[in-house]
Amino acid sequence: MTSYRNFGIVGGGAWGTALAQLLAADGAPVRLWAREADVVAAINAEHRNPVFLPGAPLSSSLTATTDLAAMTDLDALLVVVPVPYLRAVLTELPPGDAPLVFCSKGMEAGSFAFPVDMARDLAPGRPHAVLSGPTFAHEVAAGLPTAITLAAADPALATELAQALARPHFRPYVSTDVIGAEIGGAVKNILAIACGIVEGAGLGLNARAALISRGFAEMTRFGLSRGAKAETLAGLAGLGDLVLTCTSANSRNFALGQGLGRGEAIETLMADRRTIAEGAFSAPVVAAAARADGVDMPITDTVARLVAGEMRVADAIQALLSRPLRPEGQ
């Protein structure tokens, strides 16, 4: 049985920093790579990340670097890089045999590749896994109770990684359904934007509940069409994450939707953010993949058109409400 003790984190955003703090809180050495020099300097000198995770004190055993070549001699790497930039980082990652645990959510434009698909191309032979579920970074960093899915095709790898990551307040549930975990994470971000639009436009809780329910039906159709298991989509990485991010402005995607619902321009909302609302990038990609697969995803398609500036919120609401009536199971 492999023992994973020495972890590295690739990505210094809020989620990467929170995972690093989770692992370093008991004094274990953790190495984090970030592209931003100011983030690295603050972590090393002040033990905090005021850019992406303000207010969270960090362990002195957490060290940071801007040198990706330094991410070697580690037992496992948690890769927490937004999907639009993931291929470039994987290309630069030094070779090795440490497992890659992908913690970002989304689908690559053009290739329709998920993070694990990119790893097969760019890091062949390296074991890989997915960590996904209902998590807000600031709560994990603060040690609040969290449950999450850890999926790997190799059940032994999933179990060993889960045991290494588990803490009294952080409970990974093991799965072998990698594609289900990836699809749940990608689609829920899109639906969180839709629910934020409902909130921002003042359309009420009934409308939000309907969007969550019908959005979950879209997630399930898309997931099953690509080989995901229904229980994964109904679990932490799917429905659990969907409920969390569709009901709180702490979600970047929900907050982006709120702005759209209030009538703010997508360009302004995106320009004001140093952090990434992953759903804005995932929406057009998942919508295109669904069309190619012949899967009906009207909410996803509508969000894709909204973030592309092709549709006004009022027209989007009318389009969804005027769709033909159908049985609920469809």
Swiss-Prot record:
Keyword NADP set for record: yes
Chemical reaction(s) catalysed: sn-glycerol 3-phosphate + NAD(+) = dihydroxyacetone phosphate + NADH + H(+); sn-glycerol 3-phosphate + NADP(+) = dihydroxyacetone phosphate + NADPH + H(+)
Keywords: Cytoplasm, Lipid biosynthesis, Lipid metabolism, NAD, NADP, Nucleotide-binding, Oxidoreductase, Phospholipid biosynthesis, Phospholipid metabolism
Annotated sn-glycerol 3-phosphate binding sites: K105, G133, T135, K188, D241, S251, R252, N253
TM annotation in the entry: none
Single Gene Ontology BP annotation: phospholipid biosynthetic process
Pathway(s) the chain acts in: Membrane lipid metabolism; glycerophospholipid metabolism
Enzyme Commission code: 1.1.1.94
Keyword Nucleotide-binding: yes
Domain of life: Bacteria
GO molecular function annotations of the record: glycerol-3-phosphate dehydrogenase [NAD(P)+] activity; NAD binding
PROSITE patterns hit by this protein: NAD_G3PDH (PS00957)
NCBIfam families according to UniProt: PRK00094.1-2, PRK00094.1-4
UniProt similarity note: Belongs to the NAD-dependent glycerol-3-phosphate dehydrogenase family.
Stated role: Catalyzes the reduction of the glycolytic intermediate dihydroxyacetone phosphate (DHAP) to sn-glycerol 3-phosphate (G3P), the key precursor for phospholipid synthesis.
Protein name: Glycerol-3-phosphate dehydrogenase [NAD(P)+] 1
Species name: Sphingopyxis alaskensis (strain DSM 13593 / LMG 18877 / RB2256)
